[in-house]
Swiss-Prot record:
SUPFAM superfamilies: Cytochrome P450
The reaction(s) this protein catalyses: an organic molecule + reduced [NADPH--hemoprotein reductase] + O2 = an alcohol + oxidized [NADPH--hemoprotein reductase] + H2O + H(+)
Gene (UniProt): CYP2C15
A GO term for molecular function: heme binding
UniProt-annotated binding residues for heme: 323
Name the UniProt record assigns to this protein: Cytochrome P450 2C15
Length: 378
């Protein structure tokens, strides 16, 4: 069920429907950009409330991408203080920590252990159940107010599809799983990237200063950043690409099954075999990115300072199984980061050289260490 872990026809149907629906609601178009810009303004106002005092930005940075997904799926955003929203965010944050823990890696290799031993995998199961119940309640609300001639969001479109076509793939269970997948993939990955981004900019203040200089020159102070600005901001674009390359957020891709027997480089791979690819092998390829362990925006700039694309840049995976929400995630990273740096100077509580940027947990995802900073208005 869903998109992330399904295969064959189920995956094709869910991916096709999800892509089509997200595009119809403007992913990569103006309407979604409006939603992200609105959320960026809310994010800036929330950061302003810190009054330049030391704070851990993790939670606030998680709220913004989660609210964008909420607006697409539920047709409404939540206040950052909303009780249900806070609980949902708490579950998502906890799940990423659990999924990235050594214990979960052991459970993946020896699944029989999960039936007999206590452990955090049980918390993961409970959190997933909570999320699915939350989504199901929203689905029930949508069923009561559904207007087939005027779909409001992703859930409405799915319910209409269920009614129109009696597909085995389009069921309530599949709807809940697909929405859960969109939440999981569209919230935590972006929020974790944002959190690590600010940490890296604290570690490299000269990079942050150059980005702010470009923002001042291209956008100024009197309007919000928009996606049209990106093509005129090669350094900022290079910095965002380098952040994603350097952090290698999902080092090992999700497992996917081979659909038919195949021979690859003298290896025979039978149908049904699960394949796990290493994204690190391309993102940290020494031939493409000299000194790959060094954070250097120059990896994505040519000699003239223009943005330089790379076929090795694939933090969203590659091929037909690449992330459905890549366009949305790239939009969020650009608009959220430029909005933050347009309005604030990032101030570290310790000397940049003393900042530890080593991932605390490195399993499913690279999770940054806890840190604090001050958002000083500019």
């Amino acid at each position: 069920l869903g998109i992330l872990f399904s295969n064959a026809n189920t995956w094709k149907e869910m991916r096709r429907f999800s892509l089509m629906t997200l595009r119809n609601f403007g992913m990569g178009k103006r309407s979604i950009e409006d939603r992200v810009q609105e959320e960026a303004r809310c994010l800036v106002e929330e950061l302003r409330k810190t009054n330049a005092s030391p704070c851990d930005p993790t939670f606030i940075l998680g709220c913004a991408p989660c609210n964008v997904i909420c607006s697409i799926i539920f047709h409404n955003r939540f206040d950052y203080k909303d009780e249900h929203f806070l609980k949902l965010m708490e579950k998502f944050n906890e799940n990423v920590r659990i999924l990235s823990s050594p214990w979960l890696q052991i459970c993946n290799n020896f699944p029989v252990l999960t039936d007999y031993l206590p452990g955090i995998h049980n918390t993961l199961v409970k959190n997933i159940e909570y999320t699915k119940n939350f989504i199901m309640e929203k689905v029930k609300e949508h069923q009561k107010s559904l207007d087939v001639n005027n779909p409001r969001d992703f859930i409405d479109c799915f319910l209409i599809k269920m009614d129109q076509e009696n597909h085995l793939e389009f069921t309530l269970e599949s709807l809940v799983t697909t929405v859960s997948d969109l939440f999981g993939a569209g919230t935590e990955t972006t929020s974790t990237t944002l959190s690590i981004s600010l940490l890296l900019l604290l570690k490299h203040p000269e990079v942050a200063a150059k980005v702010q200089e470009e923002i001042e020159r291209v956008i100024g102070r009197h309007r919000s950043p928009c996606m049209q600005d990106r093509s005129r901001m090669p350094y900022t674009d290079a910095v965002i690409h380098e952040i994603q390359r350097y952090i290698d957020l999902i080092p090992i891709n999700l497992p996917h099954a081979v659909t038919r027997d195949i021979k690859f480089r003298n290896y025979f791979i039978p149908k049904g075999m699960n394949i796990i690819t290493s994204l690190t092998s391309v993102l940290h390829d020494e031939k493409e990115f000299p000194n790959p362990k060094v954070f250097d925006p120059g990896h994505f700039l040519d000699e003239s300072g223009n943005f330089k694309k790379s076929d090795y840049f694939m933090p969203f995976s590659a091929g037909k199984r690449m992330c459905v929400g890549e366009g949305l995630a790239r939009m969020e990273l650009f608009l959220f980061l430029t909005s933050i740096l347009q309005n604030f100077k990032l101030q570290s509580l310790v000397e940049p050289k003393d900042l530890d940027i080593t991932a605390v947990v490195n399993g499913f995802a690279s999770v940054p260490p806890a840190y604090q900073l001050c958002f000083s208005p500019v």
